[in-house]
């Protein structure tokens, strides 16, 4: 029976991993759909689509799933139509929270997001209530432990590529760009350096502090939101 129990545990874990992977692929498919719908189905002519395809491949999303999402956006397949919508609100201790969604039913999504806030010490706010606390930026990190890097040379490379700022952390170099220059900076740097991560994201320009109890509630709120099929990204201005 012990062997049978072990097999059941392995199978349960595998099923959970499969479900998690399926959720990731579904969210990526929505992101691909929106990028293709807004900028066209040709990745060569659509930088947003090109970047999300790269992101999807990095998550080992099958090519047929990627192609299906693009064809759907181009009108080659029937199905639901998705749109982007961002919700803003306050978490525990007044921490600013932004929730980026892609949905085919705004009423359902708004209800789910509002419930998540209400049940976890927060409140959903009006559009614009916290957006001013964030700025959309290209954000690239470079591993500084893998090999020796001349910081002056890296700074020059960042600026010449069109980057905005270089920050030095303990294990990483952080490169900031305007969103429109993100891809060219990333392409220039990855030919010479080991890039750990690269994304266009929302970065806080003001940070909030919170006690342990509020942080625990905030983490639960983020988990609940991220588990929602319609939610793509959750941003906060909490300083960890």
UniProtKB/Swiss-Prot annotation:
Q: Which Gene3D superfamilies match?
A: 1.10.10.200, 3.30.70.980
Q: Does the record bear Transcription regulation in its keywords?
A: yes
Pfam families recorded: TACO1_YebC_N, Transcrip_reg
The answer to whether UniProt assigns keyword Transcription to this entry is: yes
Query: What processes in GO biological process is this protein linked to?
Result: regulation of DNA-templated transcription
Query: Which compartments does it reside in?
Result: Cytoplasm
GO CC annotations? Answer: cytosol
InterPro entries for the chain = Integrase-like_N (IPR017856), TACO1_YebC-like_2nd/3rd_dom (IPR048300), TACO1_YebC_N (IPR049083), Transcrip_reg_TACO1-like (IPR002876), Transcrip_reg_TACO1-like_dom3 (IPR026564), YebC-like (IPR029072)
One GO MF term on file is: DNA binding
Coarse class of the protein's main subcellular location: cytoplasm
Q: Which residues cross the membrane?
A: none
Keywords, ordered alphabetically = Cytoplasm, DNA-binding, Transcription, Transcription regulation
Please list the disulfide bridges.
none
Q: Which family does it belong to?
A: Belongs to the TACO1 family.
HAMAP family of this UniProt entry?
Transcrip_reg_TACO1
Q: What is this protein called?
A: Probable transcriptional regulatory protein YrbC
């Amino acid at each position: 029976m012990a062997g049978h129990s072990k097999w059941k545990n392995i199978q349960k874990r595998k099923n959970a991993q499969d479900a998690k992977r399926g959720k990731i692929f579904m969210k990526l498919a929505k992101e691909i759909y929106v990028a293709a719908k807004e900028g066209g189905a040709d990745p060569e002519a659509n930088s947003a689509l090109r970047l999300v395809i790269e992101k999807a491949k990095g998550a080992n999303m099958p090519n047929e799933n990627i192609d299906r999402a693009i064809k759907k956006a181009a009108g080659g397949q029937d199905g639901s139509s998705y749109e982007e919508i961002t919700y803003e609100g306050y978490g525990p201790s007044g921490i600013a929270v932004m929730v980026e969604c892609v949905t085919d039913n705004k009423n359902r999504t708004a209800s789910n997001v509002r419930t998540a806030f209400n049940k976890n010490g927060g409140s959903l706010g009006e559009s614009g209530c916290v957006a001013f606390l964030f700025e959309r930026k290209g954000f690239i990190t470079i591993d500084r432990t893998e090999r020796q890097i001349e910081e002056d040379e890296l700074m020059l490379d960042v600026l010449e590529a069109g980057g905005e700022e270089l920050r030095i952390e303990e294990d990483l170099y952080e490169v900031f760009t305007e969103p429109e220059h993100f891809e060219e900076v990333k392409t220039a740097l990855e030919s010479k350096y080991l890039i750990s991560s690269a994304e266009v994201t929302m970065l806080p320009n003001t940070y909030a502090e919170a006690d342990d109890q509020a942080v625990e509630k905030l983490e639960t709120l983020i988990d609940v939101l991220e588990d929602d099929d319609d939610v793509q990204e959750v941003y906060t201005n909490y300083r960890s």
